[in-house]
């Protein structure tokens, strides 16, 4: 059995509309439960699925591994707020949202769409990281930044000579 006796999912407020997805639980939970562990996401040649699993060959980086992690989180087996946890973010980190899973999975699991839910749950609990806000607002400040290229070049040349400054800026902004 894929589910232990007494398996139930906890309520989850999704940000996307999952009404069209089948499954015993329906909605987002039903979409996650569509993964039947057939392992098509673990193929190493032919097709495109799953580009993050192929180099790592780590089950966590396969669509099936991510779906199983979501299933554990939804059923409360990973503790409270598991959808917004660091562990869940790490599980989803290498998903490149290419949607190869949706195209090539025999049951059409759409992990890119599920990643949106995890990202939204994490943002609701912890806020949006500075790195993501900087990238998201790039169009707003890009014209100003382009005018400050000389200052930027000066700062970059200085911080190479100040021990620890580059790593501090990297930790603060999330850029390496």
What kind of region is each of these model predictions?
Residues 79-176:
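Iron-sulfur-cluster electron-transfer modules
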Residues 1-9, 46-87, 108-133:
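Non-heme iron-sulfur electron-transfer modules
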Residues 1-51, 57-61, 70-74, 153, ...:
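Flexible inter-domain linker/hinge segments
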């Amino acid at each position: 059995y894929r589910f232990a006796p007494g398996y139930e999912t906890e309520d989850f407020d999704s940000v996307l509309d999952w009404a069209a997805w089948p499954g015993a639980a329906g909605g987002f939970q039903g979409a996650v439960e569509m993964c039947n562990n057939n392992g098509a996401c673990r193929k190493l040649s032919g097709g495109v699925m799953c580009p993050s699993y192929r180099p790592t060959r780590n089950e966590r980086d396969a669509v099936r591994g991510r779906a199983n992690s979501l299933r554990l989180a939804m059923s409360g087996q990973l503790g409270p707020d598991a959808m917004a946890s660091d562990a869940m973010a790490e599980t989803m980190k290498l998903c490149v949202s290419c949607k190869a899973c949706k195209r090539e999975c025999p049951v059409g699991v759409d992990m890119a769409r599920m990643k949106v839910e995890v990202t939204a749950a994490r943002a609701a609990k912890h806020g949006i990281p500075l790195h993501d806000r900087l990238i998201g607002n790039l169009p707003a400040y890009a014209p100003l930044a382009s005018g400050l290229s000389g200052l930027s070049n000066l700062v970059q040349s200085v911080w190479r000579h100040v021990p620890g400054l580059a790593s501090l800026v990297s930790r603060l902004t999330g850029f390496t």
